[in-house]
C-alpha cells in the first residue's frame, strides 16, 4: 500500500457583507495514496466571474494555484505545477492534483470575486 496523503480542504469566505458567502468546497477532507489524481470542487451561487484556488502551507501565506476569469478562461498562479483546472460552467471551478505527491499536502482554499 502506498503512502497516504491528507488534504484538508478549508472553506475560504472572502466576502464582505452577509454571512452566506454563496461558495462551497468539496470534499472537506481527503486522504489518498500518492500517485492518485484528486479533484477538488469549488461551487458558487453568486454568478461571479472570477474564481481562485489557493493553498496554504506552514510558514507561508496564501499562494495562488490557478484562477479563472470566466467559463473556460483560466490562468496559472505562482504554484501551478502538478495541478490542472477546469471551468465548464460559471458555478463550478475544479482543481485536480494530477498525481498526488507529499509536497501537495496542504490546506486548500477557494475564493470568488466580481
Curated annotation (Swiss-Prot):
InterPro entries: Ig-like_dom, Ig-like_dom_sf, Ig-like_fold, Ig_V-set, TCR_beta_variable
GO BP of this protein: adaptive immune response; cell surface receptor signaling pathway
Record Pfam families: V-set
Cysteines joined through disulfide linkages: 42-110
Location in or out of the cell: Cell membrane
GO CC annotations on file: plasma membrane; T cell receptor complex
UniProt signal peptide: 1-21
Keywords annotated in UniProt: Adaptive immunity, Cell membrane, Disulfide bond, Immunity, Immunoglobulin domain, Membrane, Receptor, Signal, T cell receptor
Annotated ranges, domain Ig-like: 22-114
SUPFAM superfamilies named among the record's database cross-references: Immunoglobulin (SSF48726)
Subunit structure: Alpha-beta TR is a heterodimer composed of an alpha and beta chain; disulfide-linked. The alpha-beta TR is associated with the transmembrane signaling CD3 coreceptor proteins to form the TR-CD3 (TcR or TCR). The assembly of alpha-beta TR heterodimers with CD3 occurs in the endoplasmic reticulum where a single alpha-beta TR heterodimer associates with one CD3D-CD3E heterodimer, one CD3G-CD3E heterodimer and one CD247 homodimer forming a stable octameric structure. CD3D-CD3E and CD3G-CD3E heterodimers preferentially associate with TR alpha and TR beta chains, respectively.
Role description: V region of the variable domain of T cell receptor (TR) beta chain that participates in the antigen recognition. Alpha-beta T cell receptors are antigen specific receptors which are essential to the immune response and are present on the cell surface of T lymphocytes. Recognize peptide-major histocompatibility (MH) (pMH) complexes that are displayed by antigen presenting cells (APC), a prerequisite for efficient T cell adaptive immunity against pathogens.
Record's protein name: T cell receptor beta variable 10-3
Protein species of origin: Homo sapiens
Amino acid at each position: 500500500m502506498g503512502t497516504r496523503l491528507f488534504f484538508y480542504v478549508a472553506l475560504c469566505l472572502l466576502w464582505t457583507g452577509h454571512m452566506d458567502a454563496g461558495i462551497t468546497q468539496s470534499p472537506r477532507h481527503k486522504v489518498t495514496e500518492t500517485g492518485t489524481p484528486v479533484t477538488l470542487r469549488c461551487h458558487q451561487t453568486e454568478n461571479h466571474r472570477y474564481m481562485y484556488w489557493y493553498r496554504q502551507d506552514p510558514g507561508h501565506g496564501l499562494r495562488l494555484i490557478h484562477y479563472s476569469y470566466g467559463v473556460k478562461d483560466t490562468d496559472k498562479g505562482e504554484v501551478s505545477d502538478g495541478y490542472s483546472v477546469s471551468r465548464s460552467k460559471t458555478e463550478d471551478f475544479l482543481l485536480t492534483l494530477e498525481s498526488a505527491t507529499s509536497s501537495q499536502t496542504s490546506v486548500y482554499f477557494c475564493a470568488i470575486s466580481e
